[in-house]
């Protein structure tokens, strides 16, 4: 069994800036630009809205005018807004307004537009669970001319605040109750999104080129609202979807080129558990490849994840954002120019879940590969020190038992982990002072102080230079 890459093999003890070129395998330089397909069912956390007609669960709502009427968190009666108008006229009188602060209310938005001389009706979309605004709303103006005039305020300061207007034309639905069958929707996957890119940026990029673009959604962590670096864009025209797949590959959004791929229809998407956590005992459901299996004789004190295939554009802060959703982090290290990094968690279970769920995750312009590293800042109990010491030496193979790089642990073997016994018995063929039992390799000292009568009231003191014996020695 080959040993896992360690930070000490990559980062010399005296300095983290000096790298041994032979200590690390070349980083995975396969980019994602050539991969033009993505199955939405492969994703760890496909939003429920893309799998069924149910409301999204604890996630930021997409920039979707059509979904405004489905948002149950806002109960005001707006079903008659513009109900007698022609669809084309309606689309020219309603604007989407985004990037709203959590404290923003409908009354505040209405007051802002009234200050600018606009009579408006506002529907603020709220999170159905928290009651807070979802970061966007729809504003209906008295006429197409008024709406067009209001669009000129895009990226200009909002009166009384230090924020800017973020405006766009609503592509349908808006303040009216409108039911559109999602069977006629066509989605694409959008990956490699920069952390500073929001849904407005993604929606604007696609809506400026494709008239049928109706919504954009960036997947975020439900607790922290931190972007996961990917999302989905919906179209009502299949031709626009196909054109976007062919034309938008590598287009710049924010400060990075994006990757697009075909998303599997929601009817084929796999439904995950409500908490979006896969038990460690279950088969891996990683992004692109099978998750790293936990070694049978694993060091139960290890909570460090080795991250390979890192893009040079990825920073330690971005890596921390990605992994912090799985548990409390001790530290994050990215050695310069090596295309890899290390993430140490407080709990081993957090590391196991991260390895299972983030294997092959698209980050930057490559897919990361995960495996077990070794703790550089041990936080485990002292009782595991012996196991850590033994793991440094490989036990030689015998005709009966294969070679092992770690001793059997209690949870994997009928034999408990064995340390040198203070009252060890003499066994034929074995050094004095040590008992050898099958399945329980022991650390045998080179020298032990034994009284001539063979009895001692004190534990033999082993030399620090020890060796391992197999069952045959």
From Swiss-Prot:
InterPro entries, A to Z: Nucleotide-bd_a/b_plait_sf (IPR012677), RBD_domain_sf (IPR035979), RBM42_RBP45_47-like (IPR050825), RRM_dom (IPR000504)
CDD domains: RRM1_NGR1_NAM8_like (cd12611), RRM2_NGR1_NAM8_like (cd12613), RRM3_NGR1_NAM8_like (cd12346)
Keyword flag rRNA-binding: no
GO molecular function: mRNA binding
Residues that bear Phosphoserine: 64
Region (Disordered): 1-86, 448-473
Keyword Phosphoprotein attached: yes
GO cellular component: a single term: cytosol
Polar residues bias (residue ranges): 20-39, 55-68, 453-467
Biased composition (Basic and acidic residues): 10-19
Disulfide-bonded cysteines: none
Biased composition, class Low complexity, residue ranges: 69-83
PROSITE patterns on file: RRM
UniProt keyword terms in alphabetical order: Phosphoprotein, Repeat, RNA-binding
Gene Ontology annotations of biological process type: mRNA splice site recognition
RRM domain boundaries: 95-165, 188-260, 305-370
Name of this protein: Uncharacterized RNA-binding protein C23E6.01c
Source species taxonomy: Eukaryota, Fungi, Dikarya, Ascomycota, Taphrinomycotina
């Amino acid at each position: 069994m080959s040993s896992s890459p360690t930070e000490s093999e990559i980062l010399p003890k005296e300095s983290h800036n000096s790298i041994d070129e032979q200590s690390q395998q070349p980083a995975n330089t396969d980019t994602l630009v050539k991969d033009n397909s993505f199955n939405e069912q492969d994703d760890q956390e496909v939003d429920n809205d893309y799998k069924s007609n149910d409301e999204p669960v604890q996630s930021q709502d997409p920039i979707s005018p059509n979904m405004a009427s489905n948002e149950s968190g806002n109960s005001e009666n707006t079903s008659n807004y513009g109900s007698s108008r022609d669809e084309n006229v309606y689309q020219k009188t309603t604007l989407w307004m985004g990037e709203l602060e959590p404290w923003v209310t409908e009354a505040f938005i209405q007051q802002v537009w009234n200050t600018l001389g606009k009579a408006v009706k506002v529907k603020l979309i709220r999170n159905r669970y928290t009651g807070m605004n979802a970061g966007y709303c729809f504003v209906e103006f008295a006429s197409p001319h008024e709406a067009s005039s209001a669009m000129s305020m895009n990226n200009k300061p909002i009166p009384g605040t230090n924020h800017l207007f973020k405006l766009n034309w609503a592509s349908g639905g808006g303040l009216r109750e409108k039911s559109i069958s999602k069977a006629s929707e066509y989605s694409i996957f959008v990956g490699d999104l920069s952390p500073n890119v929001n849904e407005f940026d993604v929606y604007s990029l696609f809506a400026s080129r494709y008239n049928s673009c109706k919504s954009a959604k960036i997947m975020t962590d439900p607790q922290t609202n931190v972007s996961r670096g990917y999302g989905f864009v919906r179209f009502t025209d299949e031709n626009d979807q196909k054109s976007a797949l062919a034309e938008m590959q590598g287009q710049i959004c924010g400060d990075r080129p994006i990757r697009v791929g075909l998303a599997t229809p929601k009817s084929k998407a796999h439904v995950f558990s409500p908490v979006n956590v896969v038990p460690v005992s279950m088969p891996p459901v990683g992004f692109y490849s099978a998750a790293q299996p936990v070694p049978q004789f694993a060091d139960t004190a290890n909570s460090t994840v080795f991250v390979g295939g890192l893009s040079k554009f990825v920073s330690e802060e971005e890596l921390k954002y990605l992994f912090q959703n799985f548990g409390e982090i001790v530290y994050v290290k990215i050695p310069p120019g090596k295309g890899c990094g290390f993430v140490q968690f407080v709990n081993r279970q957090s590391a196991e879940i991260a390895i299972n769920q983030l294997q092959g995750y698209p980050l930057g312009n490559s897919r990361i590969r995960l495996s077990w590293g070794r703790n550089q800042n041990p936080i485990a109990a002292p009782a595991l020190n012996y196991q850590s010491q033994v793991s440094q030496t490989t036990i030689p193979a015998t005709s009966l038992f294969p070679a092992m790089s770690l001793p059997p642990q209690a949870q994997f073997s009928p034999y408990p982990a064995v340390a040198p016994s203070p009252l060890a018995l003499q066994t034929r063929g074995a050094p004095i002072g040590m008992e050898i039992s099958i399945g329980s390799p022991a650390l045998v000292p080179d020298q032990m102080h034994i009284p001539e009568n063979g009895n001692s009231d004190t534990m033999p003191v082993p030399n620090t230079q020890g060796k391992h014996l197999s069952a045959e020695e």
